[in-house]
Curated annotation (Swiss-Prot):
It comes from Listeria welshimeri serovar 6b (strain ATCC 35897 / DSM 20650 / CCUG 15529 / CIP 8149 / NCTC 11857 / SLCC 5334 / V8). This is Probable butyrate kinase. One of its GO terms (biological process) is acetate metabolic process. The gene is buk. GO terms for molecular function: acetate kinase activity; ATP binding; butyrate kinase activity. It is an enzyme of class 2 (transferase).
């Protein structure tokens, strides 16, 4: 039996919507937003009514009768750490999102929009595998200093969706296999997945692991401390240097890997070195995760937008295919992943969780 599910993914520059009937897409739309549209909003929460109007306008334009919906699902926002799975949207969850208790991001609006529409139809609303999924082993939380614990912040939705897809292709279940999965995008996260749980992963947002097109990843601590107290930058500027303007931007002035690849193919020596270094660091992180799984790995999976680059993935494959076979599952279809999580719950294949 299949179910009609509306999926909502609010991003910093877009609102993505789709209605699925089972795994069939009835319609899908991406509405791009300009900075001018958000100019009068002081924070993400103030965008709620604007995003709600976008949602209603798109649904009306496609002529879809919302009374046919069985559930609504939104992209999970910044919440307290939770295990992976599909979560019912509750008042407790909404309270944390509305106050930005654990951080502010456009994805915080996902559950709020889903809940508002679902309540008018008397149907359930959900989120699936938010970025705060935390299944790390206790030993993996040690950073090397008691003041600071390692955190799990990664591309959980796409990691787990890719894991499920590849497990199915291998004739098994995600919960029965071991994978090292690398999401390659604006941020890069590499995780050891042991029988359905991401037991260790780099913090892809706050400075841990490989550098990416726009993030610095791990940095030598003493040198960074010198920069912090040099008087050249304030806290906000340093934050931007490591998260928004780090990585490839800091080396080559661009976060477009298409531009970087073009420079590499044109023989630009600096671009070649930076490109190779990023692939090297991803490969090294994959190797580290393989030790977490004691070398018992069913496959290494490369996913995310950068997994479409044959040049980039070939360098990773060359360094890691001795560990396990490398499978490429390019791109990230967040709407499909959101739908799949809810379809499993509605079909009784998986039980929803409470926040």
């Amino acid at each position: 039996m299949s179910f009609d599910v509306l999926t909502i993914n609010p991003g910093s520059t877009s609102t993505k919507l789709a209605v699925y009937q089972g795994d069939k897409v009835l319609f899908e739309e991406t509405v791009r937003h300009t900075m001018q549209e958000f100019a009068d909003f002081n924070n993400v929460q103030e965008q709620f009514d604007f995003r709600w109007q976008v949602l209603r306008r798109v649904i009306d334009a496609f002529g879809y009768d919302v009374n046919n919906l069985d559930a609504v699902v939104g992209r999970g926002g910044l919440l307290r750490p939770v295990a992976g799975g599909t979560y019912m949207v509750t008042e407790k969850m909404l309270a944390d999102l509305k106050t930005n208790k654990y951080g502010e991001h456009a994805s915080n609006l996902g559950a709020m929009l889903a809940k508002k529409l679902a309540d008018t139809l008397d149907i359930p609303s959900f989120i699936v595998d938010p970025v705060v999924v935390d299944e790390m082993l206790p030993i993996a939380r040690f950073s090397g200093n008691e003041l600071i614990a390692r955190k799990s912040i990664f591309h959980a939705l796409n990691h787990k969706a890719a894991g499920r897809k590849i497990a199915k292709k291998l004739g098994s279940d995600y919960e029965k296999l071991n994978f090292v999965i690398a999401h390659l995008g604006g941020g890069i996260s590499v995780a050891a997945h042991r029988q359905g749980k991401a037991v260790d992963v780099n913090n892809a947002l706050d400075g841990d692991g490989p550098f990416s097109p726009e993030r610095s990843g791990s940095l030598p601590m003493n040198d960074f401390l010198e920069a912090c107290f040099s008087g050249k930058w304030n806290k906000r500027e340093l934050h931007d240097l490591i998260i928004g303007r780090g990585g490839m931007i800091s080396y080559l002035g661009t976060n477009s890997m298409l531009e970087v690849e073009a420079k590499v193919k044109a023989g630009d020596e600096k671009a070649i070195q930076a490109f190779d270094a990023m692939a090297y660091q991803v490969s090294k992180e994959i190797g580290a995760c393989s030790t977490v799984l004691h070398g018992k790995i069913d496959a290494i999976i490369l996913t995310g937008g950068l997994a479409r680059s044959d040049l980039f993935t070939s360098k990773i494959i060359e360094q890691t295919n001795w560990i396990a076979s490398v499978i490429i599952e390019p791109g990230e279809d967040e709407l499909e992943a959101l739908n799949s999580g809810v379809q499993r719950v509605l079909a009784g294949l998986e039980k929803e969780k409470l926040y």
